[in-house]
Amino acid sequence: MENMLGLLRLHVIRGVNLAIRDSQSSDPYVIVRMGKQKLRTRVMKKNLNTEWNEDLTLSVTDPTLPVKIMVYDRDRFSRDDKMGDAIFHIDPFLEAIRIQNQLGGLPEGTVIMKIQASRQNCLSEESKIVWHKGKIVQNMFLKLQNVERGEIELQLEWIDVSGALTDDAEDVAF
């Protein structure tokens, strides 16, 4: 694999107030894309407030590529219906990793960085990047776009496999 910086584990926690696409409910699943990579969760039957609690792991070679989240309603006899989408960038998350590597020894629960919800991102509320149980994690609620309603809750975690984000590594442009 070309210059892999590390792995990004996305914990797809849940969908909240998802759109109805069948008669009274939906059978939602999530597709996650980054560059040419495409992963998906399992389908949850008849549920608009879905608890996936599923881990999907992406290889990060180009940290400037956005992560795209797409939610669909599974249909058995026709094309699956779109239930919204969202995009986020991992630059702030990777910058928080660099900060933690420089500071080291952070107390449990330390907030390393906050990202405000704005028109330039799909966050529905402030997202904090924190030091938790010896790892850097970011919890986020993404407001689904191109749909009447719905949010997806995710947690990001970095798995360093190359040392590319440590103090000793050469600068990697973000």
UniProtKB/Swiss-Prot annotation:
<dbReference type="GO" id="GO:0005886">
    <property type="term" value="C:plasma membrane"/>
</dbReference>
<dbReference type="GO" id="GO:0009789">
    <property type="term" value="P:positive regulation of abscisic acid-activated signaling pathway"/>
</dbReference>
<feature type="binding site">
    <location>
        <position position="73"/>
    </location>
    <ligand>
        <name>Ca(2+) 2</name>
    </ligand>
</feature>
<keyword id="KW-0007">Acetylation</keyword>
<dbReference type="GO" id="GO:0043547">
    <property type="term" value="P:positive regulation of GTPase activity"/>
</dbReference>
<feature type="binding site">
    <location>
        <position position="75"/>
    </location>
    <ligand>
        <name>Ca(2+) 2</name>
    </ligand>
</feature>
<protein>
    <recommendedName>
        <fullName>Protein C2-DOMAIN ABA-RELATED 2</fullName>
    </recommendedName>
</protein>
<feature type="binding site">
    <location>
        <position position="27"/>
    </location>
    <ligand>
        <name>Ca(2+) 2</name>
    </ligand>
</feature>
<feature type="binding site">
    <location>
        <position position="74"/>
    </location>
    <ligand>
        <name>Ca(2+) 2</name>
    </ligand>
</feature>
<keyword id="KW-0479">Metal-binding</keyword>
<dbReference type="InterPro" id="IPR035892">
    <property type="entry name" value="C2_domain_sf"/>
</dbReference>
<dbReference type="GO" id="GO:0005096">
    <property type="term" value="F:GTPase activator activity"/>
</dbReference>
<feature type="binding site">
    <location>
        <position position="75"/>
    </location>
    <ligand>
        <name>Ca(2+) 1</name>
    </ligand>
</feature>
<comment type="function">
    <text>Stimulates the GTPase/ATPase activities of Obg-like ATPases. Mediates the transient calcium-dependent interaction of PYR/PYL/RCAR abscisic acid (ABA) receptors with the plasma membrane and thus regulates ABA sensitivity.</text>
</comment>
<comment type="subunit">
    <text>Binds to PYR/PYL/RCAR abscisic acid intracellular receptors in an ABA-independent manner, both at the plasma membrane and in the nucleus.</text>
</comment>
<keyword id="KW-0446">Lipid-binding</keyword>
<feature type="binding site">
    <location>
        <position position="22"/>
    </location>
    <ligand>
        <name>Ca(2+) 1</name>
    </ligand>
</feature>
<comment type="similarity">
    <text>Belongs to the plant CAR protein family.</text>
</comment>
<feature type="modified residue" description="N-acetylmethionine">
    <location>
        <position position="1"/>
    </location>
</feature>
<dbReference type="InterPro" id="IPR044562">
    <property type="entry name" value="CAR1-11"/>
</dbReference>
<keyword id="KW-0343">GTPase activation</keyword>
<feature type="domain" description="C2">
    <location>
        <begin position="1"/>
        <end position="104"/>
    </location>
</feature>
<dbReference type="GO" id="GO:0005543">
    <property type="term" value="F:phospholipid binding"/>
</dbReference>
<dbReference type="Pfam" id="PF00168">
    <property type="entry name" value="C2"/>
</dbReference>
<dbReference type="GO" id="GO:0046872">
    <property type="term" value="F:metal ion binding"/>
</dbReference>
<keyword id="KW-1003">Cell membrane</keyword>
<dbReference type="InterPro" id="IPR000008">
    <property type="entry name" value="C2_dom"/>
</dbReference>
<feature type="binding site">
    <location>
        <position position="81"/>
    </location>
    <ligand>
        <name>Ca(2+) 1</name>
    </ligand>
</feature>
<dbReference type="GO" id="GO:0009738">
    <property type="term" value="P:abscisic acid-activated signaling pathway"/>
</dbReference>
<feature type="binding site">
    <location>
        <position position="21"/>
    </location>
    <ligand>
        <name>Ca(2+) 1</name>
    </ligand>
</feature>
<keyword id="KW-0106">Calcium</keyword>
<dbReference type="GO" id="GO:0005634">
    <property type="term" value="C:nucleus"/>
</dbReference>
<feature type="binding site">
    <location>
        <position position="22"/>
    </location>
    <ligand>
        <name>Ca(2+) 2</name>
    </ligand>
</feature>
<keyword id="KW-0472">Membrane</keyword>
<keyword id="KW-0539">Nucleus</keyword>
<feature type="binding site">
    <location>
        <position position="73"/>
    </location>
    <ligand>
        <name>Ca(2+) 1</name>
    </ligand>
</feature>
<keyword id="KW-0938">Abscisic acid signaling pathway</keyword>
